C-alpha cells in the first residue's frame, strides 16, 4: 500500500490479518480505512462530513459507499463473526474460563420526521426506552456479546424491524450460528429475552441461562400455581429459605425457589428485595438459573456480569458515535453499525497485558498521529510543496 496521509499502516495490517483484503476491492478497503481512521479520531461525531476530512473524496462518496456501494458487507460480517468466535472460544480453551453470551437491545434516538418529509429515515419507529421510561423514536439495535476472561467482543448487531422478525427469533437465529461451547458457559439476558425457546436454543450449544425474570411469571411452590409477584407478598425475613446476600456493595433479602415454572421444567428462581426495602411495592426483582447446582451467591454474581453489555453500549455511543449517524437507508445504517463493530474489535485486539477497548482506542489514535507526522516529515525531505501539505492537513 502506498504511503498516504489518508491511510494507516496499522489499520491496514489489522484488515489483512483477518483476511478482509482478500474479499473486498482495493477501493472498498480504502473507504473502510477512511471510516475506521475517522472513528478513532478525537472529536468524531458520526457524521459523513467527519469521514470526508480523512479522505480525498467528497462526503457524498462515503455516503454512497454506505448506502448504495457495491461491496459485500455480508462477507465482512461473516469474517468479523468468525474472528470473534476464534478469539473468544480460543481464550476459553486456553484458560478454561467460561464463555458469557450476553444479549440486550438499545435505541439510537432520532427526531421524528414531519408527515410531509420526502425522504424519512428508513425502518425508524417508536420503541420503549427503559432508560427514558417512555416511547422513543429511532432505530433499535439487538446486540449479542461474547465474553471470556475479561475480553468482551460484539458478535452481532441486528437492526430490529418488527415486520420481519421478533427479537426472540433474532436471538434464536444467532444462537443457532454459534459453535458448541468448549467449556461450561452461560447465556445472560434481562427479562425480555427469558423465554423457553431462547433458553433451549442456547442449551443446545452448551450455554446454561442466568437471567432476570418478570414478576408475572408463574411458579409452582408446593404444586400451587402462582405468579412470582403474588407469591412474594407472603415472604418474611424469618422464613427458612430467605437469606441476606451481598452483591457488590449492595445487600438483598433473597428467597430461593427450585422447581418448574411456565416454559421451564426445572430451574432456580431467586426473589430479591433490597435490604432496606423488603416488601415495598415496586422493589421486587426476580432471577432465574437453569443450572440448579449454582448457589444463590453464584447466580447473583454471575448475573451482575450482564452489566458488560451496558458498558459496551455506553462506550460505542460516546466514543464511536453508534447512535449519531445521519444515514437514511436501512442498508447504510446496518453497514455503519457493522463497521462500528469492526472498529471495536480492532481496539480489543491490540496486544496488551490487559486488552481493553479504551487502551486500543488510545493505541490507534497515537499510531495514526505518528504515521501522519512521519508522512509529513518524509514528504518534506523529498521537497514536497508546503501549500500542498497544508491542504492535506487542513
Residue ranges and their predicted role:
Residues 68-149, 250-258:
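Active-site-proximal, Lys/Arg-enriched surface segment
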Residues 61-65, 69, 125-184, 267-286:
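Electropositive, glycine- and tryptophan-enriched low-complexity nucleic-acid-binding patches
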Residues 107, 242-243, 296-327:
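Short amphipathic alpha-helical "interface-anchor" segments enriched in bulky aromatics
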Residues 35, 282-306:
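Extended, non-catalytic structural segments that build the interaction scaffolds
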Residues 158-273, 353-362, 369-374:
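An internal, acidic/charged active-site-proximal segment
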Residues 1-74:
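Gly/serine-rich nucleotide phosphate-binding loop at the start of the catalytic core
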Residues 48-51, 97-111, 144, 186-194, ...:
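Short, conserved catalytic/metal-binding motifs centered on acidic residues
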Residues 324-375:
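Basic, amphipathic alpha-helical segments enriched in Lys/Arg and hydrophobic/aromatic residues
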Amino acid at each position: 500500500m502506498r504511503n498516504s496521509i489518508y491511510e494507516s499502516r496499522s489499520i491496514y495490517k489489522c484488515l489483512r490479518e483477518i483476511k478482509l483484503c482478500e474479499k473486498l476491492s482495493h477501493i472498498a478497503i480504502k473507504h473502510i480505512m477512511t471510516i475506521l481512521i475517522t472513528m478513532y479520531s478525537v472529536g468524531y461525531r458520526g457524521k459523513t462530513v467527519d469521514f470526508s476530512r480523512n479522505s480525498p473524496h467528497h462526503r457524498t462518496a462515503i455516503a454512497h459507499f454506505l448506502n448504495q456501494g457495491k461491496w459485500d458487507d455480508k462477507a465482512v460480517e461473516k469474517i468479523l463473526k468468525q474472528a470473534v468466535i476464534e478469539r473468544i472460544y480460543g481464550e476459553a480453551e486456553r484458560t478454561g474460563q467460561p464463555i458469557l453470551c450476553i444479549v440486550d437491545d438499545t435505541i439510537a434516538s432520532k427526531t421524528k420526521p414531519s408527515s410531509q418529509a420526502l425522504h424519512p429515515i428508513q425502518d425508524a419507529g417508536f420503541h420503549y426506552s427503559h432508560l427514558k421510561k417512555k416511547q422513543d423514536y429511532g432505530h433499535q439495535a439487538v446486540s449479542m456479546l461474547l465474553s471470556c476472561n475479561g475480553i468482551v467482543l460484539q458478535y452481532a448487531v441486528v437492526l430490529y424491524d418488527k415486520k420481519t422478525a421478533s427479537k426472540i427469533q433474532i436471538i434464536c437465529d444467532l444462537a443457532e450460528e454459534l459453535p458448541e461451547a468448549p467449556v461450561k458457559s452461560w447465556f445472560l439476558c434481562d427479562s425480555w429475552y427469558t423465554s423457553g425457546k431462547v433458553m433451549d436454543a442456547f442449551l443446545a450449544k452448551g450455554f446454561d441461562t442466568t437471567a432476570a425474570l418478570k414478576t408475572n411469571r408463574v411458579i409452582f411452590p408446593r404444586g400451587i400455581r402462582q405468579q412470582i409477584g403474588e407469591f412474594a407478598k407472603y415472604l418474611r425475613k424469618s422464613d427458612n429459605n430467605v437469606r441476606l446476600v451481598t452483591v457488590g456493595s449492595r445487600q438483598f433479602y433473597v428467597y430461593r425457589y427450585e422447581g418448574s415454572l411456565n416454559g421451564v421444567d426445572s430451574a432456580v428462581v431467586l426473589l430479591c428485595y433490597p435490604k432496606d426495602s423488603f416488601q415495598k411495592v415496586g422493589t421486587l426483582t426476580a432471577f432465574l438459573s437453569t443450572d440448579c447446582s449454582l448457589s444463590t451467591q453464584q447466580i447473583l454474581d454471575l448475573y451482575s456480569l450482564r452489566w458488560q453489555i451496558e458498558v459496551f453500549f455506553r462506550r460505542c455511543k460516546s466514543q464511536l458515535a453508534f447512535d449519531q449517524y445521519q444515514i437514511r437507508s436501512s442498508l447504510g445504517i446496518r453497514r455503519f453499525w457493522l463497521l462500528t463493530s469492526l472498529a471495536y474489535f480492532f481496539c480489543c485486539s491490540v496486544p496488551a497485558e490487559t486488552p481493553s477497548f479504551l487502551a486500543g482506542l488510545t493505541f490507534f489514535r497515537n499510531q495514526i498521529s505518528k504515521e501522519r507526522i512521519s508522512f509529513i516529515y518524509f514528504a518534506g525531505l523529498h521537497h514536497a510543496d508546503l501549500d500542498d501539505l497544508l491542504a492535506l492537513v487542513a
